[in-house]
Structure formats: structure tokens, C-alpha cells
């Protein structure tokens, strides 16, 4: 589309008329990013990146700073909203074959990895018990890297244990990475607009397009309003619903929490990590749990783009959704039967989806050719 920039200027960007509510999550993610950047800035003004003062500075923000409690809660709950939206956004991409737009999909997966790193660094900053021990467990995984693992870990820590230099660099990274996310998001959107969105049918939208404004812009506003309403209801009535009780105690390296676990949005990866009773194997599986998404454009064998007309693949997709929820739940439980068995079974099921994707595509092609 040669005159696309002129159309964008006049807000007449042509969009497929049949894209559903599942296509609204991109704009919701953009809103989450703006919200996190703003609240994060106001929190950073009052935060102190020192192991003796970090916990107290969070208490100071929530108690003494005007509207500090609101900034802190919005930032914490906003992170959960961000991940809810991004997981739905990815699920939409998997279901409707958006991954066939390779550049958009690969830039999106890179964005997810940067976002997860940013959220992890942010979780360490309050320097509560769970912050400290989650950081200890996750950064320790670097020691599983052959030959250079220990050196890598000490380099990341800035010493021989998690200490003040670790917190300082995690704060610096947590501050700088969102700007990388903003840059990558711009690239992601630019790449999307070179080819345009897919649609529920998985067909070419060129024959039936409508202006983005007012049609899709109003649809986006509805979902944004629902999301912001949900955010403020949670903030007002149950602000600590996503928090871990352990994190209300200051970090103590001498006392280990009974059950170390990260934030809920990392639990699926954490569940896969601990389902393998080997440090290196678990670390590889943890990395693969996210990076395996990058294989999707290269393993698609079906003649159909979308899963709308692929019942076998639909079954696999909804199994993946159930598996994701089950791993998340199992990872909150102690490392004992039956939770270990459930974790191992669901970890196998999770990767089965990506293995079955090319096989089922090939099988469906065979069936459709036979029936013609």
C-alpha cells in the first residue's frame, strides 16, 4: 500500500471488516505499557536501590508519598494485566495463524522475552523475602551453563552472592528495558502494517476493508474501558490479590521461605523447570517453554491458515490452554506428589502441542485431499 502513510495521517487505515474482539489486545497492551511507564517513573523517583533501604522506601511510597499507594498498586496489578493481555494476544496468534507473518511473530516473541526479563527484575526491587529468594533461585540457573556458568553468575550478581550491586544493576535494567520494549513495539507495529492483520477466516482481507476509525477505534475503546475498570476495581477492593504474603517481610538470607515461587505469570515456565529433576535439563526446558513459540512459522504444514476449519488442531489448542492453566496451578503447590507428577505430565503435554502442529497439519491435508 503505497499511500499507507497518508491514510494513517488521516486516520483512515483500512482494516479487515471481520476482525473480532481478539484483535483488541494489541491496543490494550500499548495502554498497559504507557500505564507501566508512567507509574514506574513516579515510583522510581521515590525508590532507593539499596538492600538496607529498598524495603523501607516501598513502605515510604505507600504510606507517605501522596497517591504513592495508588502508583504502587497500579504498577503491580498493571504488570498482571499486561501478562493477561499478552497471553491472550499470543493465544489469538496461535489460533488464527498470525504467526505466518514471520517478522511480526518473531519480533513479538522477542518482545515477550524482554518483557519477562523486565518483570523479573522488577519483582526483585521491593527486596522482600520472595523477591530475594526468587532472584536467588532463578539467577542460580546460570550455573548450569557448562564451563562458564559460575563466572556468568558471579558477573550477574556483581559478587559471590546476591547483594547490593545485584539490586542496583537490577534497578538499572528494570528502568532501561521498558525503553527497549517501546522501541521493539514500534518495530512490531511497523512490521504488522506492511502486510496488515490476519482475520478469523485466515483469508486475504483486501476485498473487504473498512476505515480503522470510527469502527475499530470504538471497539478498542470498549475493551480498554473494561480493562481499566477491572484494574481500578482490583486496586480498590483487593489490591494484594496477586501478591505473595512472604513478600511483606524484608529479605532475610538466613531464612528460606517454605515454598519459593515467582509471580503467577511465570509459573507455567517455573512449573516446566521444576518438572525435570536435572539442573541443566530444567534450565533448557525453561528457555524452550518461551522460545519454542519462534518455531511456529516454520512448522506450519496445513493448507489452512486459521484453526477455524481445523477441528483436530482446535482440540490440541484447547488442550494447550488447559495445560497452561494446570501447570500454573501445580507450580503454586509444594514439590511433593501428586503435584510433581501433574507438573511432569502437563510439561510433556505443553511441548506436545508444538510437536503435533506439523504432524496434524500434514494429516489434515491428507484427509482433505482424500475427501475431494
From Swiss-Prot:
Binding residues for heme b b566: 89, 188
UniProt: a ubiquinone binding residues: 193
Binding site for heme b b562: 75, 174
Transmembrane segments: 25-45, 69-90, 105-125, 170-190, 218-238, 280-300, 312-332, 339-358
Example of a GO cellular component annotation carried by this entry: respiratory chain complex III
The keyword DNA damage is assigned to this record: no
Cellular compartment(s): Mitochondrion inner membrane
InterPro entries registered for this protein in UniProt: Cyt_b/b6_C (IPR005798), Cyt_b/b6_C_sf (IPR036150), Cyt_b/b6_N (IPR005797), Cytb/b6-like_sf (IPR027387), Cytochrome_b (IPR030689), Cytochrome_b_C_euk/bac (IPR048260), Cytochrome_b_N_euk/bac (IPR048259), Di-haem_cyt_TM (IPR016174)
Disulfide bonds: none
Membrane topology: Multi-pass membrane protein
Position of the signal peptide: none
Bound cofactor: record note: Binds 2 heme b groups non-covalently.
CDD domains: cytochrome_b_C (cd00290), Cytochrome_b_N (cd00284)
Any GO MF annotation of the entry: metal ion binding
Keywords, comma-separated and alphabetical: Electron transport, Heme, Iron, Membrane, Metal-binding, Mitochondrion, Mitochondrion inner membrane, Respiratory chain, Transmembrane, Transmembrane helix, Transport, Ubiquinone
GO BP terms in the entry: mitochondrial electron transport, ubiquinol to cytochrome c
Cofactor: heme b
Keyword ATP-binding set for record: no
Domain of life: Eukaryota
Complex formation: The cytochrome bc1 complex contains 3 respiratory subunits (MT-CYB, CYC1 and UQCRFS1), 2 core proteins (UQCRC1 and UQCRC2) and probably 6 low-molecular weight proteins.
Function per UniProt: Component of the ubiquinol-cytochrome c reductase complex (complex III or cytochrome b-c1 complex) that is part of the mitochondrial respiratory chain. The b-c1 complex mediates electron transfer from ubiquinol to cytochrome c. Contributes to the generation of a proton gradient across the mitochondrial membrane that is then used for ATP synthesis.
More details: Heme 1 (or BL or b562) is low-potential and absorbs at about 562 nm, and heme 2 (or BH or b566) is high-potential and absorbs at about 566 nm.
Stated family: Belongs to the cytochrome b family.
Name listed for the protein in its UniProt record: Cytochrome b
Lineage, opening ranks: Eukaryota, Metazoa, Chordata, Craniata, Vertebrata
